[in-house]
Amino acid sequence: MDKEKIVIQGARAHNLKNIDVEIPRDKLVVMTGLSGSGKSSLAFDTIYAEGQRRYVESLSAYARQFLGQMDKPDVDLIEGLSPAISIDQKTTSRNPRSTVGTVTEIHDYLRLLYARVGHPVCPNHGIEITSQTIEQMVDRVLEYPEKTRIQIMAPIVSGKKGTHKKTIEEIKKEGYVRIRVDGEIYDINDEIEIEKNKKHSIEIIIDRIVIKEGINTRLYDSIEAALRLADGYAVVDIMGDKELLFSEHYACPYCGFSVGELEPRMFSFNSPFGACPTCDGLGTKLEVDVDTVIPDRSLSLNEGAIIPWRPISSQYYPQMLASACKEFGIDMDTPLEKLTKEELDIILNGSKDKEFYFEYKNDFGMTRETWIPFEGILPNIERRYRETNSDFTRDQMAQYMTDLPCPSCKGYRLKEETLSVKVNNHHIGQISEFSINEALDFFDGLELSEKETQIAAPIFKEVRARLGFLKNVGLDYLTMSRAAGTLSGGEAQRIRLATQIGSRLTGVLYILDEPSIGLHQRDNDRLISTLQSMRDIGNTLIVVEHDEDTMMAADYLIDIGPGAGEHGGRIVAAGTPEEVAKNKNSITGDYLSGKKFIPVPAKRRKGNGLELEIIGAKANNLKNVNAKIPLATFSCVTGVSGSGKSSLVNEVLRKALARKLNRNHAKPGEHKEIKGIENLEKIINIDQSPIGRTPRSNPATYTGAFDDIRDLFASTNEAKVRGYKKGRFSFNVKGGRCEACKGDGIIKIEMHFLPDVYVPCEVCHGKRYNGETLDIRYKGKNIAEVLEMTVEEGLEYFTNQPRIARKLQTIVDVGLGYIRLGQPATTLSGGEAQRVKLASELHKRSNGKSFYILDEPTTGLHADDIGRLLKVLQRLVEENGDTVLVIEHNLDVIKQADYLIDLGPEGGDGGGQIIATGTPEKIARSKKSYTGKYLKPILERDKERTEERIATAKKK
């Protein structure tokens, strides 16, 4: 066996055509090719699956049932495999308790740091809470010079009302002769006047001492007596100086605020020992959002100002509201904004104890009379959300609720006692709010004692290393408190990459899926050097990637193709990037060598004269941003990672447009207003989420082509004779489907500690339909055979059916001619799902008032796919007059835009400002723009190439 190579023979997973390939070990290997060509099938479904399977096979049968075991890949032979670790984009944690800090384990080290060198500080008095032994107290007193006069006291009453006669009697019985009351010293036998209704402090004077040699024992005994009498507290009054307050407990001597023994679990918001009891460590509470309940205060109650109580099905709440308003004298025709504060308070929060007469008449004419207090809209929604057993009702009420910072912990997730522990005047919650860059600066500037430095040194080493790795993969703008579920696929992948670098494993096979996603060109170099450093310590890296810089940095490049789907699955070229660039059969090689490229448009559109204007956007890190987007253009929002692109487009603009145009309830990010919405009719967000969550959804059903296909089969003579309607040809309802597998075509068999096995249905043999339905044929094929066709085959087959052909043509136009009409939605990649959505939009008639938003549409796309995607996006603008707004880092997309909005200058707090706007040429001239810096050479290079191509074409 060759130890220098991973040898694969006869790989046939998905569309792979029985391929043989050798991959050098301990190298940075990049796999590329068109979307759907078989890269992931080779990298993840063959190499990783076999590496993982072999590891799991080595475990006991008992252990295997707890681990998700991979299916054995369809391959003849794989040799030279190391233990495999997959770092893809699909395994991001959606758990609200998972944060950047917990995923990278930085939070675990911070917990240890605070448990070992943290100082509890009383939140009420701002003094450090310490626990001291008697020896430490004696040593502290003896630091004062000789002849210093002191008196030792036991504070037995602290800030309590009463005459305290019983307490004074007990002191007398103990044999003490002096006490101090409210700062005045009295003989115990004196008549002491103490006012009953005022707060008082009483200390027993235990001893009076002058500091000199040989008083250690007496001092020790006196302090010990004070501690015994005052439950662990002692006061040493230094005559002519301040008083010293000592405590045996972790408690404030003034107010008694106490902190238990410091231990790491106390600083975990996932542990009951540290989590805030109000929000259970989530940092947020689900509260009713008034602005969602009443989005438009210019409406009156009769005009339906209160969305959740609009009379749709039940008249109960509208009738209750009318009765309450009548009782409390509230005019239901007055706009809500003109009601008095008291009237609005009754509507929103209820009438408390005031009752009103309510007569409810239901749809059947039955009436019910009662006197009840008015509950109020907000408490009503909250109660129905908390108490209902119906998922439907809970989902309905959830639309009007939002996560607000917890009032107890202010969003820090931890108990008050935990947040009282400080290191350099910062509690652990504040450090978690730092960005990676700020955290690095904080730890570099920490001031600790010699002993603390010694304890914290190994912790600092680990924390700094992990922060450094996050910075190196371009994530220095993230905060450690950022919820893992809010990260993009690329960010989550690079976090796991940083965690793996921190482990410093060697001899491992890492398989990565497009780590450059969401990364600005500026940060790409750092990512590449990180990958190279992982290789240099003795690991093999297989990276599925389309980024040109990453491909050129590879030791070995494998191009899979030549096409996608059925047209792919072969090794087209393999070798160094330079060798692949010279290969005439490789599309990737053509793009690397410059033979093929995406041209620069000859002119930029100005739009139709109308524009959308965002005013005062402040969501997340946006700094009161104003932005204009010309309508009927292809516009692009750019900027370094974390600069605020998603905040501006997705949080503010998309949610505001969806709320206005689509009646969506999602609350937009903070902004003043958006002008020009009246020029639009609909907003379409085309993201990379699946087109369906079950295998029953497929490209034919999503684009609507399947409806027309079922109509066609139902219109055949045989179907009419048998009385079959359109529903007969659906695999989702009884009638035409196979009932043995309920139209799935496969049956799942659970194998417990082995992977679940899916076998074709024995009755329909995977065809989904019963025999009678399959008897119906159109042009020689039944419905099951039609679903097995590729889109290209379907287009030819239905060429005489314009309704179907038009829909299938758009799927071919977006470069998905290779997918099958009935291919389950769950097997489509994110990029493929996004293009199916685009295709379904292309065949719709438009009036130029649609607004499309795409967030990084080039994810998973080869340069050739990007060229096709751009043609489709330009078509939406050119032919339909619609507006397309894209968030993108890919320079091929950016250079094709009509208008750019560049955010920055940095990520996180250093971003959130508009750096430059205008055409790509204008941005390229900007000295402040990082995007412009990288765009300029690409524009110049490709303009030159475009001019050369035009000149060559003219000569011919």
Curated annotation (Swiss-Prot):
Keyword Metal-binding: yes
Keywords assigned by UniProt, alphabetized: ATP-binding, Cytoplasm, DNA damage, DNA excision, DNA repair, DNA-binding, Excision nuclease, Metal-binding, Nucleotide-binding, Repeat, SOS response, Zinc, Zinc-finger
A molecular-function term among this protein's GO annotations: DNA binding
Binding site for ATP: 33-40, 639-646
Subcellular location: Cytoplasm
UniProt cross-references to InterPro entries, sorted A to Z: ABC_transporter-like_ATP-bd, ABC_transporter-like_CS, ATP_grasp_subdomain_1, P-loop_NTPase, UvrA, UvrA_DNA-bd, UvrA_inter
Record-annotated ABC transporter domain positions: 309-587, 607-936
BP term (GO), one: SOS response
Record-linked Gene3D superfamilies: ABC transporter ATPase domain-like, ABC transporter ATPase like domain, ATP-grasp fold, A domain, P-loop containing nucleotide triphosphate hydrolases
Keyword DNA damage listed: yes
Major subcellular site: cytoplasm
Zinc fingers classed as C4-type: ranges: 252-279, 738-764
Entry GO terms, CC: cytoplasm; excinuclease repair complex
Subunit structure comment from the entry: Forms a heterotetramer with UvrB during the search for lesions.
Family, per entry: Belongs to the ABC transporter superfamily. UvrA family.
NCBIfam families for the chain: PRK00349.1 (NF001503), uvra (TIGR00630)
Function: The UvrABC repair system catalyzes the recognition and processing of DNA lesions. UvrA is an ATPase and a DNA-binding protein. A damage recognition complex composed of 2 UvrA and 2 UvrB subunits scans DNA for abnormalities. When the presence of a lesion has been verified by UvrB, the UvrA molecules dissociate.
The protein's name: UvrABC system protein A
Lineage, uppermost ranks: Bacteria, Bacillati, Bacillota, Bacilli, Bacillales
